[in-house]
Amino acid sequence: MGLILMLICAMMTSISIVREKETGTMEVLLVSPVRPLWMIIAKMVPYFVLSCVNLVTILLLSVYVLHVPVAGSLFSLALLSWIFIVVSLLLGLLVSTIARTQVEAMLFSGMVLMMPTVLLSGMIFPIENMPLPLQLISNVIPARWYIVGIKKIMIEGLGISYAQREMGILMLMAVVLLIISLKKFNKRLE
C-alpha cells in the first residue's frame, strides 16, 4: 500500500509545476499576487483528494478481495495514511521544482523514488537484516515509517498512540520537504 500510494502521489504531482513551465502559464502565475506557499498548496489539494480515493480503493481491495484483516481503528489508519499522502505529494512537488521537463519529472519520480522505496522501506527485506549503512539510509525513506505504522495499526490492532513516533517522523519529513520545495521554487523564480 505504501509503494502504490507513494508512486501515484509523487508521479501525479511531479509533473504539475513542470507542465506550468512548459505551457507558459507559470509566467502568468508569477506575476499574480499569489505567494509560492499558496501555489504549492493549491497544486496539492486536488491530488490529495485523488490520493484519498486511491487509499479507499486500496483498502477496499485489501479487505474484500485479499482478505487482509484490519485489526485497528480505521480513523488511525486514515490519519497515518493522510500524513503519508502529504509527504508523498510534497516529494513529488520537490521533483517538480527540480525537473526541467515532464518526462524528466516522471522518470525521476518513477525510478529514483521507486527503487529505494522497494528495497529500503522494509516492505520486502526486513530492516533489521540489512547492513548498518542501509539501515541508516532507510531512516529517510518515508515509506519505511508508514509501513511500520501500518503494521502497528492494521495488523497488531494497536491504537494511534502506538504510532505517534512514526506519525511525528512523517510530519517532520513533510515540513522539511515543504521548506526545501519553497526554497527551490523561490530560487527558480529568481
Segments the model singles out, each with a brief description of its role:
Residues 59, 69-190:
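Membrane-spanning alpha-helical segments of multipass transporters and channels
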Residues 11-32, 44, 190:
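Transmembrane helix boundary and interhelical loop/hinge segments in multi-pass membrane proteins
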Residues 23, 31-37, 100, 159:
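Juxtamembrane helix-boundary/capping and inter-helix hinge elements in multi-pass membrane proteins
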Residues 34-61, 78, 82, 167, ...:
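Selective transmembrane-helix segments that form parts of the transport pathway or gating/packing helices
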Residues 1-13:
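Long, hydrophobic alpha-helical segments
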